[in-house]
Every structure is written in structure tokens, then in C-alpha cells.
Amino acid sequence: MSGYIEKYIYGKFALDYWDVPAIRGKIEPPDAIFPEEYVIFTDKPLYRPDRAIIHTCSIRGAEKYVEGPACTLPLVFLQVALDYTIHELIYLGLQICSYREGDRPRCTVEELRICAEELRGHRGRRKALRAIRYLCDNSRSPMESILYMFLRLPNALGGCGFKEIVLNEKIVLEDGGKTYFADLYVPSCKLDIEYDSEEFHSFASALSRDRERAAHLEAEGFRVVSVGYSQLTDLKAFRNLVRQLSRLIGKRVFIRARKFFENFVALRDLLLRKGYSLRSRFRKVHRHEFPWYSGVRAAYKIYLAAWNRLVRHPNLPLVLTRAP
């Protein structure tokens, strides 16, 4: 009788196997090389040769989340959850559930949720469930994912808290039956938020198509707002964008959470750092590093008070946190 136990590709190495897009240069350095890692589903002692990284998993039901030589993405999401910050993990989840033209998606948010809820006791489960709360299917680009995070995440995670936003909603026009997909869509006010990539929207033909598309949508009562990269990188432009969206959606952005400041900076790091480490939670956020929404003045005073307590009493329980 053979004692051979099958091993399966694990963790970040499995992200490469499943070809999850736009990880390097966003949450990993552009030249990152993931080590070969495997998992074996057993609760028995195991010989681990020096040439391979082998993990064991004894959680009942985990063994069904495999396909071919690798763990499936719902299980991989749990395996890597503690390797990333909460913002990086949300971004990863959006990319895992991103749209693939002409093919089924790699994974869906519901599949991630079912796996995380089922595998009680798995490493990273609690953090994964927290991230899954903010995920949405069908992102078509890394910048769509990041724009979605800026607008959808709650204030305590650095976002605007526009909870209705969904990604790539299908819109079928009554007049002529034309079909469009909205990059980000708010159903209650028929608002289409389009991310204009400099790579794909700078040609005359693309600009002409965009204008025609906007005209068709606006003729049937939809409102279209275009967002460029500079509106995300420039704080004043971003504040003006949020004010415009706030008026159209009918939801006021009012900051009460002191964690807004460090987490907004974390989102900016995700946008600008290109896969290199996010700022330390122990580095103070200054006034010029965030947009001045309503409520920011009072909330920033609370943030500074918490920061000063941390500086004076560094050995006491952490009073200023960004989720690890």
C-alpha cells in the first residue's frame, strides 16, 4: 500500500498558477518572485525536505478546494490573508474576482465567502471575511479596483462610504437596444462613473466613442462622470470629484472616524507606491496628506490626541491602529 500523499500548490505561488492579474506593481514589487509552496491535507507528522516549502492543513473540508495541481482561489485567499494589509487584501480579492472577457471569471465573491465561512479555524479566516465584506465582482482593470476602493470603502478604511457602487453593471438602453457596461455604477441615481485610462482613452477614435456613449446614456436619464488618473493623485482634484459625486448620489461625506487619516494614506500608498511597502502605522499623518471633507477638522483633532497618547506612552496598548 502506497503512503504517498498528494501535495498542492499553495499561497502566493498559487496566485501565479491561476494567473491573477496586476499583483506585481500594486501589492507586490514589480520584480517579485514567489517561492514554490505546497500544502498537504493531513494531521500526521510530515517530513519536509529543504528544497521545498510544505505546509499541512488538517481542517475538515479544506481538501475539496483543489483543482488539478493547485488549491483553488477561495482557499488561496485564506492562505495569503495574513501576508497582506487589509487594503492589499481587498485589492487582491477584487483582482481575483475580476472579469475575463470571453471566459468565466476565475472566482466570485460568493465563492470566496462560502469557503471562508466553511473553514472555521483556518489561518487568516477572520481577516479574509472582513475583506470579503467590501468586495464586488467584475472589475476590469487594477485602476477600476483602486477607484472602487476609494469610493466604496467606509470612512474608517479611508474611503468615501458610497455603499451602492457596483462594478461593470450591464445597462441596456430602451431606444435602440444598445448595451453598455458602466465601470462603476450607482443604481439608485443611474450614475455611471467611468475611469478614463490614458492608455485607452487618449486616441481621437476612443474619445469619439466615449462622447457618443455618454450622449446615448444621458438621453435616457443616466448621468455620466469621467475620472482620470490625475483626479486620484491630486488631493484638491479628488476632493472636488468626491463633492460632485456626493451631490449626484445624494449622500454627504462626513468624516467621524479617526482611522480615516491613516487609512486614506494607505489607499494613496496602494495607488502610488507601485507594490512597495505601505507606510508604517507609527508615522504621523500630516494635514496636507488628506482631503478636507466635512467633519475632518474635528476628527483630525481626535486623531492627533490619539497620536500624542501613543508617542507619550508607546508601551501601552496601541491606540492608533491600521489593521495589519
Predicted features, each with a name:
Residues 1-123, 257-260, 264-324:
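Short gly/ser-rich loop at a beta-strand->alpha-helix junction or flexible surface loop bordering the NTP-binding
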